[in-house]
């Protein structure tokens, strides 16, 4: 999973240079929360992801 998180980080950094980059960062952060199954962090995430509801 660490490999996937690095890929998400690179995507979020590229997204910061474009309009709407904040939403990409949020999505990457929420996926990171979901991947780590950190319940406290998933509650902080603003995007309702279908996979999040399963937790």
UniProtKB/Swiss-Prot annotation:
Record localization: Secreted
Covalent cross-link 2-(S-cysteinyl)-methionine (Cys-Met) as placed by the record, residue numbers: 33-41
Cystine connections: 30-45
GO annotation, cellular component aspect: extracellular region
Entry PTM: This is a cyclic peptide. The first step in SKF maturation is probably thioether bond formation.
Propeptide: 1-29
Coiled-coil stretches: none
Expression triggers: By Spo0A and PhoP, during nutrient starvation, especially phosphate starvation. Repressed by AbrB during normal growth when nutrients are plentiful, in association with the transcriptional repressor Abh.
UniProt GO BP: defense response to bacterium; killing of cells of another organism
Consequence when changing residue 41 to N/S/T: 50% wild-type amount of Cys-thioether cross-link made
InterPro entries assigned to the protein according to its UniProt record, in alphabetical order: RiPP_SkfA
Keywords (A to Z) from UniProt: Antibiotic, Antimicrobial, Bacteriocin, Disulfide bond, Secreted, Thioether bond
Keyword match Disulfide bond: yes
Covalent crosslink: Cyclopeptide (Cys-Ile): 30-55
Knocked-out gene: effects: When the skfA-skfB-skfC-skfE-skfF-skfG-skfH operon is deleted, increased rate of spore formation; a double operon deletion (sdpA-sdpC plus skfA-skfH) makes spores even faster. In a single gene deletion no SKP is produced.
Primary localisation category: secreted
Role description: Produces a 26-residue extracellular sporulation killing factor (SKF) that induces the lysis of other B.subtilis cells that have not entered the sporulation pathway, providing a source of nutrients to support sporulation, and at the same time delaying commitment to the energetically expensive and irreversible onset of sporulation. Can also inhibit growth of other bacteria at high concentrations. Addition of SKF to solid cultures induces killing, but it is much less effective than SDP (AC O34344).
NCBIfam families in the cross-refs: RiPP_SkfA
Something else known: Accelerated cannibalism by skf- cells is seen on solid media but not in liquid media.
Name of the molecule in the record: Sporulation killing factor
High-level lineage: Bacteria, Bacillati, Bacillota, Bacilli, Bacillales
Gene that encodes the chain: skfA
